[in-house]
C-alpha cells in the first residue's frame, strides 16, 4: 500500500539517493498528523453503522427514482447492496486513515469502480452524494477534533473526486 513514507522511500530509491531534507519534512508532517488520522479512524469505526445508514438514506432521498422498477434500488436486496457498498468504501476510508495514504482506496476501491458501475448500470453520482453528505454532515467538535475532521474530510474528498 502507498503511504507518504513508502512513496518517499520508493522515490529516493528509484533515484538512487537518500531521502532529501524536504522528503524527510514531508514524512515528519505525516507522522505528526497520525494521531488525528487515528482519532478519525476510531470515531468512524465506532460509529460506522450510523454513518453508513445516514449516507445511504441521504443517497436514496436525493435520488428517489433509484427505487423505481429497473433501477439500482428496485427491491430490498438491491437497496441492501447499495448500503453494503457504502459500508465497503467507509471501511476503505478507515484503512486510508490508519495507513496515512490512499493505497487502500486506490487498490481496493477506485481501480475500475467507474467501469463496474457503468457496466452494472449503477449511478456513481448516488454514491458520490452519500459521501458528500457524510463529509458535509461532520460536526466539529461533536464528532471529532478539528484536525481529525480535516483528515477525515481529506480522505472523503479523495474518494469523491476519484469517483467523479
UniProtKB/Swiss-Prot annotation:
Family in the record: Belongs to the phycobiliprotein family.
Membrane disposition: Peripheral membrane protein
Keywords noted in UniProt: Antenna complex, Bile pigment, Chloroplast, Chromophore, Electron transport, Membrane, Photosynthesis, Phycobilisome, Plastid, Thylakoid, Transport
Record PTM text: Contains two covalently linked bilin chromophores.
Disulfide bonds: none
Annotated residues for binding of (2R,3E)-phycoerythrobilin 1: 82
Lineage per the UniProt record: Eukaryota, Rhodophyta, Florideophyceae, Rhodymeniophycidae, Ceramiales
Cross-referenced InterPro entries: Globin-like_sf, Phycobilisome_asu/bsu, Phycobilisome_asu/bsu_sf
Record PANTHER family: C-PHYCOCYANIN ALPHA SUBUNIT (PTHR34011:SF4), PHYCOBILISOME 32.1 KDA LINKER POLYPEPTIDE, PHYCOCYANIN-ASSOCIATED, ROD 2-RELATED (PTHR34011)
Compartments reported by the entry: Plastid, Chloroplast thylakoid membrane
Protein's name in the database: R-phycoerythrin alpha chain
